[in-house]
């Protein structure tokens, strides 16, 4: 208890010499010149540079990242429009060719005019639809994988009498059908 700790604002003995030298020479340090601040700035700068380099590497390897669903739909409409406009129709022959191309261009322009306002008003809707589609695809894939696993493993799972997929080869589930009575129900043996 006889030891007293210096107040927290007081410099440590090794820092006291540096503070005295600074005061003696008239140099001052700003808040940005503190050792911790410059280290943090250097660290942030290095992290930002690394992140930009990684993004550039991925763009070079995989191409530009996909945009929002609205942008992707807009690109799809433009691509389809370009392909349809450039098609030569062999069915219509040389006589109807220019007229048919004009009709196709007009239809494409009308489709673009109808789609653009919807995309502009509801860009988030397409992101939500894309997310919902991804969830549906995942659910479908899971169901198909489970069914394929069941088909390929030889059906070693225990049979559930209430599951219509588990009926035996005769199409029955093991319950007594009775004498083929007049009603649509099945006879249940209570004894």
Curated annotation (Swiss-Prot):
Keywords: Carbohydrate metabolism, Glucose metabolism, Sugar transport, Transport. One of its GO terms (biological process) is glucose metabolic process. Residues 11-26, 147-178 have a biased composition (Basic and acidic residues). It holds the Pfam family DUF5304. Residues 1-42, 145-191 are annotated as: Disordered. It comes from the Bacteria. Induction: Transcribed at low levels from its own promoter. Transcript includes downstream gene glk. Expressed when grown on glucose or galactose, levels decrease as cells enter stationary phase. May be involved in glucose transport or metabolism. It may form a heterotetramer of two glucokinase subunits (glk) with two ORF2 proteins. This is Uncharacterized protein SCO2127. It comes from Streptomyces coelicolor (strain ATCC BAA-471 / A3(2) / M145). The lineage of its organism: Bacteria, Bacillati, Actinomycetota, Actinomycetes, Kitasatosporales.
């Amino acid at each position: 208890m006889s030891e007293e700790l210096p107040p927290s604002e007081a410099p440590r003995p090794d820092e006291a010499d540096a503070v005295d030298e600074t005061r003696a020479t008239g140099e001052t340090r700003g808040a940005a010149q503190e050792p911790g601040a410059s280290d943090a700035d250097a660290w942030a700068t290095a992290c930002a540079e690394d992140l930009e380099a990684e993004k550039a590497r991925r763009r070079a390897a995989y191409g530009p990242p996909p945009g929002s669903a609205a942008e992707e739909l807009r690109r799809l409409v433009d691509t389809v429009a370009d392909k349809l406009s450039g098609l030569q129709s062999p069915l219509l022959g040389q006589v109807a060719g220019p007229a048919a191309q004009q009709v196709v261009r007009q239809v494409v322009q009308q489709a673009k005019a109808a789609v653009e306002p919807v995309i502009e008003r509801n860009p988030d809707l397409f992101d939500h639809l894309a997310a919902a589609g991804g969830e549906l695809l995942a659910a479908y894939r899971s169901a198909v994988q489970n069914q394929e696993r069941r088909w390929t493993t030889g059906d070693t799972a225990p049979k559930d009498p209430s599951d219509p997929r588990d009926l035996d080869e005769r199409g029955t589930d093991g319950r007594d059908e009775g004498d083929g009575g007049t009603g649509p129900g099945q006879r249940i043996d209570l004894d």
